[in-house]
Each structure stands twice: as structure tokens, then as C-alpha cells.
Amino acid sequence: MAIITIDRVISHLLSKQTIAGLDLGTKTIGIAISDISLTFSNPRPVIQRKKFTLDALKLIKIFDHENVGVAIIGLPINMDGSNGPRVQATRTFVSNIAMYTKIPFIFWDERLSTIAAQRHLLEIDVSRIKRENRIDSAAAAFILQGALDRIQILRQNHTEG
């Protein structure tokens, strides 16, 4: 498993592979999966966190089922740009999951992704109880969509250059 940068995504993907977006919480792991054209992110059901090994195995099973070639994981940087304890927890999670997969990971600044997801769910009139169950996957979809949009720009620049 490697940590790569967004500009190296395309070189790591095989034909028809997708990209996963992850929002790592203390109780759940929000998941979103791209389409094969790497244009749209689609939220998936969250993983209810139990023990690291069980969480990792569930995640790897999803990666295999969804033909994931790269994973984008939200990095919860503080609003002032500093790294808090959640940043270290996320980095440790990625380091530990290396025992289970060779899929490369990209850290992606997730500032305001949960707020954006909450606003979106409110705008489409999702009830409070359903919002609680969907917020982490909606945040994962926002994280992934930001990365997919960046990949599209990089692709355009590559074909124009």
C-alpha cells in the first residue's frame, strides 16, 4: 500500500476500476464509490465501526466488490490548517490497513465536507433520523466528488498539454 498524490491516480487505475471515498469517523466509516468514468460519486451504506480488524475486512470486501483501485480518505485538518488528533488517527488507520490491501490511498482535505453534506441533506428534506444514518456517507461522497473534479481538471490539462 502506498500513499500517492491526486496527480498519480490515473496511472494507478486499471481499466474499469473505481475510486472509493472514505470519511473516517469514530463510530462509522462513510463510503462513496465513483462510477467507472470517474465522474460521479455515489454514497454507499456506512460501516458501523467495531474493531479495527473487522472494520478493515469489511472495507476490503467492499473494495473488492466495487473494483476499487484507489481510495481517497478525508483528512480532518483543523480550520486553521493545523493537524489535530483526528489527523493522526486517520494516518494511523491508513498505515494499519496496509496489512490488508495494496490499494493506494490519497489523503484529501475534508474541511467543511460534513457541513456541506448536512446542508445538502437538509435541502432535500431528509428527516433528522435519516440524516444521522447518512451523514458520513454523504460526507464521503463530497470528499470523493472533490477529488473526481480535480482528476477531471488534471485529465483536461494532460490532453491539452
Curated annotation (Swiss-Prot):
**Which Gene Ontology MF annotations are present?**
nuclease activity
Q: What are the record's GO terms for cellular component?
A: cytosol
Q: Which InterPro entries match?
A: RNaseH-like_sf, YqgF, YqgF/RNaseH-like_dom, YqgF/RNaseH-like_dom_sf
State where it is primarily located: cytoplasm
A Pfam cross-reference name: RuvX
Coiled-coil residues? none
Q: Where in the cell is it found?
A: Cytoplasm
Q: Do the record's keywords include Glycosyltransferase?
A: no
What SMART domains does the record point to? Answer: YqgFc
Q: What class of enzyme is it?
A: hydrolase
User: Keywords of this protein's UniProt record, alphabetized?
Assistant: Cytoplasm, Hydrolase, Nuclease, Ribosome biogenesis
Q: Name one GO biological process term.
A: rRNA 5'-end processing
EC number(s) on file? 3.1.-.-
For this chain, the family text in UniProt reads: Belongs to the YqgF nuclease family.
Q: What does this protein do?
A: Could be a nuclease involved in processing of the 5'-end of pre-16S rRNA.
Q: What is this protein called?
A: Putative pre-16S rRNA nuclease
- Annotated source species: Bartonella bacilliformis (strain ATCC 35685 / KC583 / Herrer 020/F12,63)
The upper taxonomy is: Bacteria, Pseudomonadati, Pseudomonadota, Alphaproteobacteria, Hyphomicrobiales
